[in-house]
UniProtKB/Swiss-Prot annotation:
Residues 180-462 form the NB-ARC domain. It comes from Oryza sativa subsp. japonica. Signal peptide: none annotated. LRR repeats lie at residues 481-503, 504-528, 529-549, 577-599, 600-621, 622-644, 698-722, 759-781, 782-804, 805-830, 851-874. Residues 1-176 are annotated as: Structured coiled coil (CC) domain. The lineage of its organism: Eukaryota, Viridiplantae, Streptophyta, Embryophyta, Tracheophyta. This is Disease resistance protein RGA4.
Length: 996
């Protein structure tokens, strides 16, 4: 594990080492020679590490660990050297010519120090390489390697299971699975349709997928419903091995099986065994789509027989592939509080203590996070440590990340976590996962902010290439593998906030500490060695004594949650910071900004606390890519910000300075088209700012949010109209990409909007204001896929005009009421998601055959009565219905009944809104509560009412596939009940895609 992460880190710093050879740094010839040596040496080290990783087993654990420590120290030393040169070069560029002349002697001295530093690094590289060769060569074994049980623990695959029972989870451990089991058994027994049906069970490791499949298998094999049945494990096996095992189980006599048969022949033999028989096959732990593609051709698809295949997998895209045609996808959910407590108590408390008052287990239940395997193994661990009379949960929790790796009782849980980590393809994904350690365990993490921080750290690239992954792709892979979970998902199916599971968080903490990846200061727990990423959270204020001997100048990332103290907030001690997250720092003040503006390598900056004004010196941050002031009190954005050459994302709600009316360097910068700004979300305007003239020169702007504010002098909105017109102008390019506009125009004249003209292009539009008719430019928009409108009332004419938007995929309407309107067969031909939020239940009439591709329907009105004449059986692709949580129980029951009678059996969900429609500072605005359509009882908020407004998450999970693999043809997915599972972030308008 350490080797892979280190190899990736060295690969990441090599390009920066190359940059030092560039003539612009004016290094001495001898210094350049030393840098060339280090480049070649690091390449060889990376090659040696990659060779070790490519073998079937790692090198001797002790030697390998020491070698990795040597190389990590070397790599960090090289990175410090590189960034030190870049830092000094950036500071020199900001000095006047006179100042640079005065500093010339000091520069010569620095060059001498650099030469000495490079010589030291050369010696370190040579010595580390020699030690590695000397001691690994001395270790006997295959390929000159030695193996240990500790190393084998990491890479040894799961034992293949030869029966239907899961060797890791006994039947006695099954708690809270009744509803899942009944749903699965119903899918197996369902007679319509009669052709082959594939049921995919998907979820994070340890949620009980195999145990659930085993429950169904054991019941069905004894029932006589199926003529042939078999169970095989696919984990860590080739398709040929899986097919061979399956054939052995089907052919009791062994006459059909030949050990030298290839996959194609095995498929033929299996088909002969299964043809014209009703069969039930379980394939446990499928890991790739290619593996499934090679296996599935072995199964006959005879009609009028009704065979069933159940597959289990941890990977969402694999589950989607398995049940893409006539399939059913079952997403595993975690146990609720009561079931979690029951399972933990069963495993932790010996029978002789059944009447003993058990200690408070809240802390350990939070760590287990409803994961059955975690509850079982932690329960056994507690019992081994004397529960309930021994140490309390709090004490054991504090060192749980240590016990995970070192305690035999927790070995099963540790192996699951290690497997998830080591299976990630490439070093970048491992670094991205470990970066979650920067956040407190119960802190929702904003996806876009996270991606920008990954970019600032250099883990990923802005765009994918043959050798590097981009930030969005990295996030999607982690989602696809169910390693991270979405908490809050916007109406248009975009993940807004996420977090990791409880035990995965413990694993990340352990790995981050052991790899010196993140240093934590949390409730007085501080492990100083050298600090590259520093995260402070808890109620403890850091004072100077805590930081004795710690060099803060090497910190690359700093995040503060709570109070930091004067020592941490002394930014004169930092030099190499790239990421600075202070939006939740309680003791941040305007005075701190002076030194922050000297952090010339800074790429990501988020501010909160009591910050009310940005200084002009922010212009020094030439490398800054993202500036987020949404949680601050900044009301005026200094014009100097718009002159930052690397700035891509500017977030907040601010007014713009009028100083650009005067000729300035910023104005000249913008006029030359040098701005890289892509996101401006957003600013408040009264239509008269001189800045609006310059927006036309922001050629790369892709996301714009504007609040129109009325004032005494705001009678002429010409400048604002022209700025918007320029932004939406259609250049008639084949692929413009995404372009989003969010416009709150209640404070300005409607003429400013109605006078916008074609040709125009937007992919997403949000309009908030009063408009009796649809603005003309909306109907002429090319590329419009997402539209969100908010007004007091929508007229029939406006609604009919909307139905002609032929490319619209998502529509959200928020109003008090709608005039009478019929959605006809020809209307909204490509609409996938429809959300209507009303005060009064004036929903439209939907003709039979209309909305042919609708996947999700959200009817959010607490006074909704029954089905409101909406016949959901007409929506052939419907996967989900969402209602306001305030509807009556009778209305809920009607929708549950209708959903159960629908061929797709769509989910029925309740949305409980939080009144934060216009809040720019709310991480999570709402909570989705699932109603299990299989029962008459509503499983609403199983985590208890006290957590509804805190955790804000889906108890029944959600499919990351919708983020990863957008399917254009939903016809292939019509029978997959849980293929797309969404949540929505509030009933207001701040969730549309053009908003942050």
């Amino acid at each position: 594990m350490e080797a892979a992460l280190l190899s990736g880190f060295i690969k990441a710093i090599l390009p920066r080492l190359f940059s030092l050879v560039d003539d612009k740094h004016k290094l001495h010839k001898g210094v350049k020679g030393d840098i060339d040596f280090l480049i070649k040496e690091l390449r060889m080290i990376v090659g040696a590490i990659d060779d070790d990783l490519s073998l079937d087993h790692p090198a001797a654990a002790a030697v390998q660990t020491l070698c990795m420590e040597d190389l990590r120290e070397l790599a960090h030393g090289i990175e410090d050297c590189i960034d030190g040169v870049l830092y000094r070069a950036a500071r020199d560029q900001q000095q006047s010519p006179v100042r640079r002349a005065v500093q010339a002697p000091k520069k010569l001295q620095r060059n001498l120090q650099l030469a000495q530093q490079l010589q030291r690094l050369k010696r370190m590289a040579a010595e580390a390489n020699q030690r590695k060769q000397r001691y690994t060569a001395a270790a006997p074994g295959q390929h000159g390697q030695v193996y240990s049980s500790a190393a084998a623990q990491v890479d040894e695959p799961w034992p293949s299971c030869s029966s239907a029972s899961d060797p890791r989870i006994h039947e006695a451990d099954l708690v809270g699975v009744d509803a899942d089991r009944e749903e699965l058994l119903e899918q197996l027994a369902e007679r319509q349709p009669e052709q082959l049906k594939v049921i995919a069970i998907v979820g994070f490791c340890g949620l009980g997928k195999t145990a659930l499949a085993a429950e169904a298998y054991n019941r069905e094999t004894g029932g006589g419903r199926f003529e042939r049945h078999a169970w095989v494990c696919a984990g860590h096996r080739s398709a040929r091995e899986v097919l061979g095992e399956l054939l052995r189980r089907l052919d009791a006599d062994g006459r059909s099986f030949h050990g030298d048969s290839d996959a194609g022949q095995l498929c033929v033999d299996i088909r002969q065994q299964l043809e014209k028989n009703r069969y039930f096959i379980v394939i446990d732990d499928i890991q790739t789509e290619d593996q499934w593609k090679s296996i599935k051709s072995a199964f006959p698809t005879d009609k009028d027989i009704g065979s069933r295949i159940v597959v289990t997998t941890t990977i969402q895209s694999v589950a989607n592939a398995c049940c893409s045609a006539n399939g059913y996808l079952h997403k595993m959910s975690r146990l609720d509080k009561n079931c979690s407590k029951q399972l933990l108590s069963k495993k932790a408390c010996p029978e002789r203590y059944s009447h003993y008052k058990q200690p408070d287990s809240a802390a350990i239940l939070k760590k287990c996070d409803g994961q059955p395997l975690a509850l079982v193994t932690i329960g056994e661990f507690l019992q081994a440590n004397g529960w309930p009379t021994g140490p309390n949960c709090e004490d054991l929790c504090n060192r749980l990340h240590y016990h995970l790796e070192n305690d035999k009782t927790l070995e099963r849980m540790w192996r699951v976590l290690v497997r998830n980590y080591t299976s990630l393809p490439g070093h970048a994904l491992k670094a991205c996962l470990l970066y979650f350690g920067m956040f407190p365990s119960d802190h929702p993490i904003r996806r876009k902010s996270l991606l920008r921080r990954w970019l600032a750290e250099g883990f990923v690239e802005p765009l994918s290439s043959s050798s590097n992954i981009d930030s969005t792709a990295a996030f999607n892979v982690l989602m696809d593998r169910n390693i991270i979970e979405p908490i809050n998902v916007s109406n248009n199916d975009k993940v807004k906030t996420c977090q990791t599971y409880g035990m995965m968080r413990e694993f990340i903490s352990h790995m981050s500490i052991s790899q010196n990846f993140v240093t934590f200061f949390c409730d007085d727990k501080f492990v100083p060695k050298y600090v590259r990423r520093l995260s402070l959270h808890g109620d403890t204020v850091v004072n100077g004594d805590n930081f004795n001997g710690i060099d803060l100048s090497l910190v690359r990332s700093l995040a503060v949650f709570g109070e930091a103290g004067t020592t941490v907030l002394d930014f004169s001690k930092y030099q190499l910071l790239r990421v600075l997250d202070l939006e939740k720092c309680d003791d941040l003040k305007d005075d701190h900004l002076k030194e922050i503006c000297n952090l010339v390598l800074l790429k990501y900056l988020s501010l909160g606390g009591n910050i009310s004004k940005l200084p002009k010196d922010i212009a020094k941050l030439k490398d800054l890519e993202a500036l987020d002031v949404r949680r601050s009190k900044v009301k005026i954005m200094p014009v100097e910000v718009f002159g930052l050459p690397c700035l891509i994302h500017l977030l907040g709600k601010f007014k713009l300075s009028d100083k650009v009316k005067q000729k300035t360097e910023v104005q000249e910068f913008l006029l030359k088209g040098k701005s890289n700004l892509q996101t401006l979300a957003g600013f408040a305007s009264n239509g008269s700012e001189g800045f609006l003239h310059l927006m036309r020169y922001m050629n790369k702007l892709r996301k714009l949010k504007i609040w129109c504010t009325s004032s005494a002098g705001s009678t002429d909105w010409t400048d604002l109209r022209e700025a918007i017109q320029q932004f939406i102008l259609d250049e008639k390019e084949a692929n413009i990409g995404t372009r989003s506009l969010s416009l709150h125009f209640s404070g300005c004249s409607e003429d400013a909007i109605n006078s916008l003209k074609e040709p125009c292009y937007l992919s997403s539009l949000k309009l908030h204001g009063n408009f009796p008719q649809l603005p003309q430019f909306v109907t002429s928009l090319r590329g419009l896929k997402e539209l969100c409108l908010s007004s007091t009332k929508f007229t029939t004419g406006l609604l009919e005009a909307l139905s002609n938007l032929s490319y619209l995929q998502y529509l959200k309407l928020v109003a008090d009421e709608l005039e009478k309107f019929i959605i006809k067969v020809q209307g909204f031909p490509r609409l996938l998601r429809l959300c209507i939020v009303l005060q009064y239940p004036t929903f439209p009439v939907i003709e039979e055959g209309a909305l042919p591709f609708l996947v999700t329907l959200q009817l959010l009105c607490k006074d909704l009565h029954g089905l409101s004449d909406i016949q959901i059986e007409c929506f052939k692709h419907l996967q989900e219905v969402t209602l306001h949580s305030g509807v009556t129980p009778a209305t809920r029951q009607e929708w549950v009944k209708a959903a159960k009678e629908h061929p797709n059996r769509p989910k029925v969900l309740l949305l409980k809104s939080v009144d934060t429609a216009e809040s720019e500072h709310t991480d999570v605005d709402s909570v989705m509560e699932a109603v299990k359509s299989e029962t008459t009882e509503y499983s609403i908020a199983p985590e208890g009412p006290e957590q509804v407004n805190n955790k804000m998450q889906l108890d029944h999970g959600l499919e990351s596939s919708s983020v990863l693999n957008k399917q254009n043809n939903f016809a292939d997915q019509s029978s997959s009940k849980d293929q797309l599972h969404y949540s929505f972030n509030n009933m207001g308008l701040s969730d549309v895609s053009c908003c942050e």
